């Protein structure tokens, strides 16, 4: 279990990004000059299968006393005119000396591996995607299955998508072995609309239901200055709404794109979070594609969070992920198109760096008694080959 808000949140985002790269929003991109950093032209009439491709990536995270790195692989191949299969492999090697660990326990190292298999089937203007994922680490085992369906309507100008995921986890600790379970349901609905030949917009709503053991066996809370084991509710219901706009703002060889995203998250633990991200993408010549982006996130604390509780309650947590905090991220990405290799493989080299700064408003470092904050550095290097 990774115990820092920055690293755990980032690694979940990274795994999701790898799973959907590079077909993300490609269908809508056929009607734009630039969409989210992928530039294409043409008309939108029917859904195409994702390209045959292979991706290899190295990821690195360093922040808040936690260091995580490892490789990731993704392979996708068409096996029929309408069917494509994919598989991915992901490793996190974590060295954890975060504030949660060094103040209540000893630093530790662990490795997490994840495997996934998926299939995409297209028929006319519809696509069905089925995938399964299994993740294993010394004290946590997770399995999930997802089903997503998308349908283009109104001549390809609108795409409607529906999806559902089911997860089943085994929760443990280094001291007790596996001692409990957790279950997760996720339901998704989205609409992507081409507004003009240069602009599109999407809206996505997700509902999440969790039950079982939802805490962390290594984390403790403070009650009257005394350390006690955290106590979490065994159920949680969450909602997330995301709005995204992407547009082509370039002309001729000065092709460029601008994107803006807003996400609102709320749950029955009374957490509320707002996230805003803006990005700019531009070609530099025929071979180089650059992107710069900035992201801001702010969160309000959970009902049962307390830095140092002054009364006994049924639930209590000092998990900084549930506190009041904000984070700012700024990053850049560069893509180099190397062209054809062996007259078959179209190769692209990619590098992305992001700097993040976390500031906590009501979580203190018990070593210094000051409000806690930390900075994080994130690096991704990957190569993609279509064939």
Regions inferred by a protein language model and the residue ranges of each:
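Cleavable N-terminal export/targeting peptides
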Residues: 1-50, 387
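Short glycine/proline- and aromatic-enriched beta-strand/turn motifs that initiate or cap beta-hairpins
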Residues: 44-86, 356, 377-378
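Short loop/turn motifs that connect adjacent beta-strands in outer-membrane beta-barrel proteins
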Residues: 45-51, 82, 154-158, 198, ...
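Transmembrane beta-strands of outer-membrane beta-barrel proteins
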Residues: 52-56, 85-87, 128-130, 158-162, ...
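Transmembrane beta-strands of outer-membrane beta-barrel pores
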Residues: 58-62, 91-95, 123-125, 134-138, ...
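Residues that define the transmembrane beta-barrel architecture of outer-membrane proteins
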Residues: 67-71, 111-115, 122, 141-145, ...
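Residues on the lipid-exposed face of transmembrane beta-strands in outer-membrane beta-barrel proteins
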Residues: 73-77, 117-121, 147-151, 189-193, ...
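Outer membrane beta-barrel transmembrane domains
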Residues: 100, 104-105, 208, 214-246, ...
